[in-house]
Amino acid sequence: KVCDLSIEPERIELYNWISENHSNLNILVNNAGIQNWMNVSDSDFYQKANDEITTNVLAPVHLATLFANLKSLTTIINVTSGLAFIPFSKVAVYSATKAFMRSFTLSLRHLLKSKNIEVIEMIPPALNTDLGGKGIHDGHPAVSDFVESIFEQLKEGKTELTFGTSEARANANNEAIADYFNKMNP
């Protein structure tokens, strides 16, 4: 089933289709996301920010709300980012959406405890993908290395899955956060 997650009726249609055709689905992975490198003075900043917020925040919140009602659901995995902890100013809105999703994930974990739905946060660092634009992340770790590490952490029962620089950011104290921020945002 193909769905544009930025369109609310399509999200509802996706949920209805899955509940009718795959009612035994037990895991929701909220991994949709867009990242725009932009400056607040760009003429299209607001529209791009709105698109990022819709796709990176409203869509996964809506999907979690819908799928939490699926009787077979046992796990929700929300994908955030190492930028949830320390923002990169060139992708300020993206960083903020991932910080929102981190906070939401922590609360959702608590809220869904009574329904026996486990909520896991997957926290990737920059990986060698085209997120944000072609070639921007060349030289970063391979997705396959990240996935291998994530599966090991899932086997260990972890609920916050980190890798590489995202692990350091997730565990950083205030001084380290300030140092990271200053290095990332000269």
Question: Where are the regions a protein language model picked out?
Answer:
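Conserved mid-core segment of classical short-chain dehydrogenase/reductases
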Residues: 12, 33-50, 90
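Active-site loop immediately N-terminal to the catalytic Tyr-X3-Lys motif
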Residues: 88-92, 135
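Rossmann-fold cofactor-recognition segment
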Residues: 1-9
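Active-site-adjacent segment of SDR/Rossmann-fold oxidoreductases
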Residues: 71, 86, 107-118
